[in-house]
Structures are given as structure tokens and as C-alpha cells.
């Protein structure tokens, strides 16, 4: 009997030791894993060496920790819709990136796929001028003349938007920025580009870790990368708080009311930019693909969020089907957000 008791006692002791050791190992593994994740959360700072005492912060890169913030439920809904559109041959490629600006949760479907951006890059030109205004406050009032030479250059741009400028007339930089963003006026864009401080514009691209378009052919960007510009404006971490507020106010006055804007209820503010572009065969001059993108911040009642949708269709299209796809995804995301999900 005594031997049996001893045996039972020893078994219990070894069991307790085993459980303790297992718990200790699990704790140590969990601790090391958590430590690794935390170490991978790193600040992304301005690529600016003009300062001696400061190193301005733009945002944080969450590394592998970001996967704990991934909203897979929304992702699955978006992906199911995209697959339906592929089956119906309504688009060749669709990419979406969503980010909750309050809680940091995100969803992405083909979010790292890159596209020819078109006019959505006008936002960076605006940021460059606001950046320059911090050095020279008179820049916004400076008048620029819309010449016939500029008008000739504008007429050669594919998908050129209605030009609101008159040859021979002068316009303030501030007016041109508003026209470029609100109406996506390519004339205003061209005139601003010809007069921008190129060094500051290059710095903007460098600071935001984006390749300068002129340094590469077939320039492309992904929805995920583009969203970082919107987040930086929202957080006011690159240009001043006053300028960031003003820039987003201009974006909220966009006259483009298809896409994301059409997918949310009337009265919901959307600070957004859209862009169109084409792929053209260099030999035959035939249009092989049409691009339509729409990216912005939706100020939903539940919480503000970024949504960037990029689309590519085969051949030359009128954008209607692509705009409908963007609208549908926007409506889906808005409904999901305001149902209390994704917090």
C-alpha cells in the first residue's frame, strides 16, 4: 500500500513539474514572441537632414504586429465581391485597402498590387506647395500666367479634364491648387508643376518614401502605399495642422461624385481624389487597358476611415463599370463600419 501511495505521490509531483515546465516554456515563448513583435514596431521619420535637433515623425510601421489588427471579416466580404466581378469580366484587376483611423484595424485585398496612378498623385503636388509655404508664406498668393504654350501641352494629355483657365490670364497659386484638386483640372496641374520648387517636390516624394515619377518609366503605386499620404494628412505629421486641415478641406470639395462618394449616404463627408490613366501599346498605339482609381477619407459616424480602390479594365472603357465597382465596395465598407463591426 505504501509503495502505491509513493508511486501516486511521485506521479503527481512529476505531473505538477511537467505542467509547470510546460507553462514556463509557453510563457517564455509567448514573451519572446511579444518582444519580437514590439521590436518590429518602428517609427517612420522624414528623410530630411536639414534639422540638427529634431527628427520629425511621420507614422509608425507596425511590421508583423499589423497582422493582429487585420479585419478578416471585412476582407472576406470585399474579396467575395471582387471574385464576382472577375467572373463577370467587369475588370481585369481590383485592389482595395481599408484602414480604421481610430483603432488602426485594416483590411486589404490585392493591396500591394501597383497601378499607373493618374491624377491621384496631384495630392503630393499640393503637399509640396504647402511645404514650400512654410518657408515662404507669400507663395499661395503668387500669381502664375496660363500661357498658350502651357495650353498646348495640356491638350495632349489623355483624359484631359475640362480646363477652367483662360490663356493669358493669371491665377493665384491657392486658386490653382483648389482647381487642381476639386476639379482635377489638368491645366492647373501642369501650370503648378512648371512652377513648383523641384527640390521641395523631390523632398516630398523622398520623405514619404515614394519614388519620384520622373526617375522611372511606367510609374506605379499600390493602394496600401497611397493610403499613407492620406493618413499623414489626417494625422498632420508632415505639413502643419492648419495646412493639413486646409488640404483635406479642399479634397472634401471634389466635384467627382461617383465611386466612393456615391457609395455613402448623402451628408457624409469624403475627402478624396480620383485618377484615370491608360496603357497604350507603343507599336500599334492601341489602348490595352483603362485605369480608374479613387482614394479618400470617409468621415463616417462610427469612425473615420481611409479607403483606396484601384481598378484596371481591358481595352478602352468609359469607366462606368469601374466606377460602379468602386461605388459598390464603398457602400459595402460603409455599411460594415456603421453596423458596429471593425472597431
List each language-model region with its residue ranges:
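Active-site-adjacent helix/loop patches that line small-molecule binding or acyl-intermediate pockets
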Residues: 58-74, 146-253
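Short, conserved catalytic-motif segment at the N-terminal edge
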Residues: 90-114
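Active-site Gly/Thr loop motif
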Residues: 259-289
